Amino acid sequence: MYFQLPIERMARHREMPSQIDFAREALLALEEPDYARFEPTERGLAMFAASEEDLERPVATLQRLYGEAVDLRPPRVRCLPGHPLQQPVMAFEVAVPREHSLAVRQELRQRDARIEEEYQRRRTCVFRGIAPLRDLLGLGGRLAALSRGTSRHAMRLSHYAP
């Protein structure tokens, strides 16, 4: 199940009747890195990754190869089955120019992130903490908008929790 890869994204071909044939064809064009896995399924190509950013390169490759014919579903958080259901919790680090730190702190709090450490290095403010992955989806794009493209961030799976 790739427990270490808590994000899934499906790719389908709008014009091919057999999604598994599309997935097998697409798989030949993709280089599988250490931080992602790709599987052909009856629903299309399943792509599993450690973070949204880890899927950017394969998504760009599929868009370049298939253009408008490829249907990319939004990223989905993968939980561990059982009672109770276990969801992925991510450790994150965000570095942003000091002038954008208030907006970024507010964004992290709105996402129910637990900021465990905050410090400044020269003109950069760094936030470290944890949050459920479901609350962090889309964070990269939002940080780029808040900081005019000057932020950096990284996430990794910390653990699973109910």
Task: For each feature predicted by the language model, list its residue ranges.
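Accessory interaction regions appended to the cores of large information-processing enzymes
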Residues: 1-162
